[in-house]
Structure formats: C-alpha cells, structure tokens
C-alpha cells in the first residue's frame, strides 16, 4: 500500500492562512510490513527514522493503538520552502491511522484533525481534499470550501535557502491598524469572489495586492519582485510568495512558460524551478 500526498501552495497573496491549492509534487509513503518497532526509511537529512518522524507521530496522535510499521518514504517536496511539506506529512499520518485503525474518517473529519495540528487550514485542506480550497476557523471548528480549479500551469521558483514558517512569522507585525486591516480584508474577499467566478484577470491583480504578509516578508525573499517583473513581461496571471516562502509561485498559461523560464535565466534567476499543475485529487491510497 502506498499513500500519495500532494504538496500545496498557500496564501495566494492576501488569502493569508486561508486559501491554498494542491499541486503536483508528491510525498509517497509505502507500507512495507508490520514490525516490532516503527522504522521509516528515507534519504532526507535531519528527518527522524523512528516514531518521532512527523508521519508516525501524527498517526499515533490520531490512533494511539497503531501497530509498529516499516515504512519507506519517497519525497519530491522541498522542505521548509513554502510548499506545505509538513502538511503533506501530517495528511499521510492521518491516512495511515485511518486505514490501519479502521477509523472510517470522512474527509471533513480528516481536515478537522489536520487543521487542529497545523493551526490553520490553508495547506492541510487542499492536501486532503485536492484542488483550490478556501478555509477558516471559527470557535475551534474549521470550514473548507473547494473553488473551481484554475486552468493554468504553475511555475515554482525554489531558492537554494530554506525559510522556516516560524522564522518568516517573526517579521510580521503583531497588530495592523484598522484601516489597513479592513482594506486587506476587502482585497481578500474580492479575491475569493473572483476565484469562484473564474475571473482570473481580476484574481491575478488581487493576488499581487496583499497587505497582510508579503510587504514584510519580501525582504526575506528578494527574488519575489524580480520574478514578478519578469512574469508581467511574459503575460503571467500572477506571482506571489508561496506560503511563508522561500518558493515564489507564478500562474501562467502553458504557451508562455518557455519564455518565462528564459526571462528568469536572463535576469540571473537560476535556482531550481518546477513546472507544476493543480492536483484535483488530494491524498490517495494506491493498493
């Protein structure tokens, strides 16, 4: 049995801690056998191989009676780069617990569990449900609604440096003045409306109009504005900081991808790039 979990791109500019989309990079967890102890085989530096691994830790949180398993992990999702790697591990752990504990969890219950662990639904909801998802938390209950899937290619520019979410949050202000907060909220509200009505020209403009986090984080990811400038020249829909960064994500029509990549190269932007697409399925079990 293999659990296949997509990566995710979150915030989409002003949809801070609320909007996210599953994308076509994957974490795969293969169950090799029952064992006398938890063993997680992988080649990722500084990630535990025992029950302290986030996948196993999550599974045991959901189902403490889980029998020890020998697992093999294949991961294509860059860690600490704003592509939801921790949410993907958490989703895999929930699925592991649900399957072997015979819990019969619904997708909605899985989202509740994952969002409680994460603290917000922007990555975990699309990772579980697939597609583009808008979510929030009210009175410790998480709501998530799927929007239409955008018809674009995604180009993820992944700088060589990591940027942990906790470090990226340190640069955010503790408070926003009322005028800024209401303006930011109006931008986010209109972004949601444009995504659901598939008005992507408007959505692109709004994705690049955030006041909640990008103005404070752009100094941590200096490539953001450079890439956005190239993207505008190459007819892209929008460019934004994926999650907390350091990945910069661009929505673009497939016919313009080659020119965009060439433009990045000409501007000396030569870090790894991934050509991705929205993932509509979310977490899957492959028998």
UniProtKB/Swiss-Prot annotation:
Cysteines joined through disulfide linkages: none
UniProt: ATP binding residues: 78-88
EC number: 2.7.1.39
InterPro entries: GHMP_kinase_C_dom, GHMP_kinase_C_sf, GHMP_kinase_N_dom, GHMP_knse_ATP-bd_CS, Homoserine_kinase, Ribosomal_Su5_D2-typ_SF, Ribsml_uS5_D2-typ_fold_subgr
Signal sequence, renumbered to the chain: none
GO CC entries: cytoplasm
Transmembrane segments: none
Keywords (A to Z) from UniProt: Amino-acid biosynthesis, ATP-binding, Cytoplasm, Kinase, Nucleotide-binding, Threonine biosynthesis, Transferase
Catalysed transformations (reactions): L-homoserine + ATP = O-phospho-L-homoserine + ADP + H(+)
Pfam family, one: GHMP_kinases_N
Location in the cell: Cytoplasm
Molecular function, one GO term: homoserine kinase activity
Top-rank lineage group of the source organism: Bacteria
SUPFAM superfamilies named among the record's database cross-references: GHMP Kinase, C-terminal domain, Ribosomal protein S5 domain 2-like
Enzyme class: transferase
UniProt pathway annotation: Amino-acid biosynthesis; L-threonine biosynthesis; L-threonine from L-aspartate: step 4/5
Protein's GO biological process: threonine biosynthetic process
Free-text function comment from the UniProt entry: Catalyzes the ATP-dependent phosphorylation of L-homoserine to L-homoserine phosphate.
Family of the protein in this entry: Belongs to the GHMP kinase family. Homoserine kinase subfamily.
NCBIfam families: thrB (TIGR00191)
Record protein name field: Homoserine kinase
Species lineage: Bacteria, Bacillati, Bacillota, Bacilli, Lactobacillales
């Amino acid at each position: 049995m293999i659990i296949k979990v997509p990566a995710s791109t979150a915030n989409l500019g002003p949809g801070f801690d609320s909007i996210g989309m599953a994308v076509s990079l994957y974490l795969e967890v293969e169950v090799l056998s029952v064992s006398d102890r938890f063993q997680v085989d992988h080649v990722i530096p500084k990630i535990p191989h025992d029950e302290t691994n986030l996948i196993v830790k999550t599974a045991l949180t959901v189902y403490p009676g889980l029998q020890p398993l020998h697992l093999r992990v294949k991961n294509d999702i860059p860690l600490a780069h704003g592509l939801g790697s921790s949410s993907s591990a958490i989703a895999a752990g929930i699925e592991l617990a649900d399957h072997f504990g015979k819990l019969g969890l619904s997708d909605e219950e899985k989202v509740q569990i994952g969002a409680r662990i994460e603290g917000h639904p922007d990555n975990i909801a699309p990772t579980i449900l697939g597609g583009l998802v808008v979510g929030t938390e009210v009175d410790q209950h998480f709501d998530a609604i799927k929007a239409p899937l955008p018809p674009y290619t995604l180009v993820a520019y992944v700088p060589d440096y990591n940027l942990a979410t906790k470090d990226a949050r340190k640069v955010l202000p503790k408070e926003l003045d009322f005028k800024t907060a209401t303006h930011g909220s109006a931008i986010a509200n209109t972004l949601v409306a444009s995504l659901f009505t598939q008005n992507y020209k408007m959505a692109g403009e709004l994705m690049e109009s955030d006041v909640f986090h990008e103005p404070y984080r752009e100094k941590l990811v200096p490539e953001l504005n450079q890439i956005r400038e190239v993207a505008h020249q190459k007819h892209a829909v929008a460019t934004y900081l994926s999650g907390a960064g350091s990945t910069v994500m661009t929505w673009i029509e497939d016919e313009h991808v080659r020119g965009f990549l060439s433009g990045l190269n000409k501007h000396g932007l030569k870090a790894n790039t991934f050509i991705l697409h929205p993932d509509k399925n979310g977490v899957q079990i492959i028998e």
